[in-house]
Structure formats: structure tokens, C-alpha cells
């Protein structure tokens, strides 16, 4: 793996040199191309200059901020680095807390942190301290020209930096029309709890994979051979309030 960032973890006055690696693989899906409907020729996207109508190569493209209509300030990598030199080079620990305090909606993307030569002992100390305390570290860091919030957690021998969303990144559900619990009977709740208990087991991520893509690949293979496919509608029927108890009981029986 190639590091996507090199800097240090700031733990009090201790600076731990680290490299950052992506903790996720690119999602493997079908590589679908955009085609012209008339002749099935691939569509090509181009970077066109609005002024002269010419295509612009990547080497001639820069980033800019429109501070007034039609007027731009061009920004270079040096400008991004100057904005806050410390934050561009540091994963700054701002506090510690218990993991359940963080709303699961905030978690966005994991990264691995690996100690650079000379940082092994301090890295190991922070990792063991987090293990022993049961706490996680809340951090701030800058990557891809943007400051992020993060949660630093130990996982085995590694330190994982989970990128977090800011509260302003989340939408409120206050305007949703949500039911109250007043219409739920005690008996319905008991049966629902039995179904949950019956389906409760340890979570093993390896048991899950993308079956939708696999089925879509089978459709593609069939169409490539000229086969016509007939697909039955699988739209689920909504359970009505009058059928709720009977359906819950049927679910219990089906799982036994």
C-alpha cells in the first residue's frame, strides 16, 4: 500500500511520526460505460474551456475561488499548506471520550496509521494506553485540502483513524412524519422481541457480500448470449396494521 499522508500524531507534547494508509478497498462493482443510445458508441467526457471552447489537458488546470462574478483567485498547493502548517502535518488529539458517546451517523471512513522509523515506542504507548483505558481519542487533521474530525481507536496492533462527519454534514430528521409508540400493543412488542432474540447472533462481516452485483453479472452474461430474460416482480406488499400480529407470528414460525 502507498501512504496517502505523512505527518505525526500530537499526543500532549509528544509527536509520533506516522504514515496514513486508506483502510478501504475501492468498491468492486460492474464497470459500466455510458453509451450513445443510437449506435452504442462510448461517450467521452472532456474538460472544455468556457471561453475558447477548447479541450484543456490536466496539466493546464488549476484550482480557483470565485470571489466576485467572473473573477477568481488561483490557489496552489503552497497556499493550501500555508493555511495552517501545523494542521496539514499533524493528527491533533483534542480530547478523549467513551466510544458510545459518538453517534454512529458520524463515522465515515477508516484509515490505518503506521509508525515511521523512530516512532514505534510512542506509537505503542498510545495504543496500549487506549486499550487499557477503553477510551478513544478525538482528533482533527487536514487531508485533501479540508479539515476533518476523527476518532483514533486501537485495533489489535494498529491505530485506526476513523474520519468523522461534522454535525453540519448531517441532515435533521425533525420534519419527518414518524409514528409514536402509542399504537403498539404489549403483545405485539413481545412477539417482535422474540423475533429479534431468535435472529440475534454474532456479526461476522465475511458472511456478507454483494449478491446484487453477482446476479446482475448473470443477466449480462445471458444478454450477451442473446437470451431473453423474464423477471417476476418482487415488490414487497406492505403489512397492514390488522395483519401485523399474524405476520410476526408467521415470521417466528418460519425461522424455527
Where are these regions (language model features)?
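Boundary segments of small protein-protein interaction reader/adaptor domains
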Residues: 1-256
Amino acid at each position: 500500500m502507498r501512504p496517502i499522508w505523512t505527518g505525526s500524531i500530537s499526543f500532549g507534547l509528544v509527536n509520533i511520526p506516522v504514515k496514513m494508509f486508506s483502510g478501504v478497498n475501492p468498491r468492486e462493482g460492474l464497470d459500466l460505460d455510458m453509451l450513445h443510445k443510437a449506435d452504442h458508441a462510448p461517450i467521452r467526457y472532456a474538460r472544455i474551456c468556457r471561453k475558447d471552447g477548447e479541450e484543456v489537458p490536466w496539466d493546464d488546470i488549476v484550482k480557483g475561488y470565485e470571489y466576485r462574478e467572473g473573477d477568481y483567485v488561483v490557489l496552489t498547493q503552497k497556499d493550501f499548506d500555508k493555511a495552517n502548517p501545523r494542521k496539514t502535518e499533524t493528527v491533533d488529539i483534542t480530547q478523549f471520550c467513551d466510544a458510545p458517546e459518538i453517534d454512529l451517523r458520524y463515522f465515515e471512513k477508516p484509515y490505518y496509521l503506521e509508525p515511521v522509523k523512530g516512532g514505534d515506542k510512542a506509537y505503542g504507548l498510545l495504543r496500549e494506553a487506549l486499550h487499557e483505558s477503553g477510551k478513544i481519542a478525538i482528533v482533527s487533521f487536514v487531508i485533501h485540502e479540508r479539515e476533518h474530525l476523527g476518532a483514533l481507536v486501537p485495533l489489535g496492533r494498529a491505530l485506526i483513524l476513523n474520519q468523522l462527519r461534522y454535525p453540519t454534514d448531517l441532515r435533521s430528521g425533525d420534519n419527518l412524519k414518524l409514528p409514536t409508540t402509542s399504537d403498539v400493543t404489549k403483545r405485539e412488542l413481545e412477539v417482535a422481541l422474540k423475533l429479534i432474540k431468535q435472529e440475534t447472533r454474532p456479526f461476522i462481516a465475511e458472511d456478507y457480500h454483494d449478491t446484487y452485483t453477482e446476479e446482475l453479472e448473470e443477466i449480462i452474461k445471458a444478454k450477451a448470449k442473446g437470451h431473453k430474460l423474464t423477471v417476476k416482480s418482487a415488490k414487497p406488499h406492505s403489512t397492514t396494521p390488522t395483519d401485523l400480529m399474524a405476520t410476526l407470528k408467521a415470521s417466528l414460525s418460519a425461522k424455527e
